[in-house]
From Swiss-Prot:
Gene3D superfamilies given in the database record: Vaccinia Virus protein VP39
Organism superkingdom: Bacteria
GO biological process: methylation
EC number annotated for this UniProt entry: 2.1.1.-
Family matches, as PROSITE patterns: SAM_OMT_I (PS51682)
Organism expressing this protein natively: Mycolicibacterium smegmatis (strain ATCC 700084 / mc(2)155) (Mycobacterium smegmatis)
Protein family: Belongs to the class I-like SAM-binding methyltransferase superfamily. Cation-dependent O-methyltransferase family.
Residues at which S-adenosyl-L-methionine binds: 37, 59, 61-62, 67, 85-86, 135
InterPro entries with a match to the protein in the record: Cation-dep_OMT, SAM-dependent_MTases_sf, SAM_O-MeTrfase
Binding positions for substrate per the UniProt entry: 133
UniProt-recorded name of the protein: Putative O-methyltransferase MSMEG_5073/MSMEI_4947
Any GO molecular function: S-adenosylmethionine-dependent methyltransferase activity
Length: 210
């Protein structure tokens, strides 16, 4: 029998339904082997996009566009999503979902390239929300750059902060775990940030900038 905590998380994950457009994007993600956030994570991203104003949002890891669709659903009608992915084919497929959702081309800026390089070209303190869903070993660098991009009151959200529980296993010391712990340390020790770890998906580490 699942513990009460596990039951609550399971209930939360099952409580969100997706529309046909997001469901189709999720199927395409499965087809190309691109990871996609769970519906509950997507719903939380939509809420955070709305709470932070949703005018300018950065996403690291476009995938097939599932998380992008959720982010856009919470953003302002004139908000712009800048989404970065090293795989041009993933972005081509994501564009299909954005088009099906009626998202105008002026509301998305898809940048194909290494996020480590692209993020450094984005302006300081100009974004309401930064969502990171990429290789865990790169989380520390993405956190540093992501926090730099945030305006006052903006939020950073890092997915895969739990690594299936390995991040909390004292005996685990592989490269992914080490990087995830370092990203968490950077956020925890930044006095400008108020953080929280949310047990949805593979763990979400979120923080708001003062």
């Amino acid at each position: 029998m699942a513990s009460s905590a596990e039951a609550i998380v399971t209930h939360a994950e099952r409580s969100i339904s997706e529309d046909a457009i997001v469901a189709a994007a999720r199927e395409r993600a499965d087809d190309i082997g691109a990871g996609a956030v769970t519906p509950a994570v997507g719903a939380l991203l939509s809420v955070l996009a709305r709470l932070t104003g949703g005018r300018a949002v950065v996403e690291v890891g476009t995938g097939a566009g599932v998380s992008g669709l959720w982010l856009l659903s919470g953003m302002r009608d004139d908000g712009v999503l800048t989404t970065i992915d090293v795989e041009p084919e993933h972005q081509r497929i994501a564009k299909q979902g954005f088009s099906e959702a009626g998202v105008g081309p002026g509301r998305t800026r898809l940048i194909s390239g290494r996020a480590q390089e692209v993020l450094t070209r984005l302006a300081d303190e100009s974004y309401d929300l930064v969502f990171i869903d990429a290789d865990p070993v790169d989380q520390p660098q993405f956190v540093v750059e992501g926090v730099r991009l945030l305006r006052s009151g903006g939020a950073i959200v890092v997915h895969r902060a739990a690594l299936g529980g390995r991040a909390g296993d004292a005996d685990a010391r592989d490269a992914e775990v080490t990087a995830v712990r370092e990203a968490a340390r950077l956020i925890a020790e930044d006095e400008r940030l108020t953080p929280v770890l949310i047990p949805l998906g593979d763990g979400l580490l979120a923080a708001v900038r003062d």
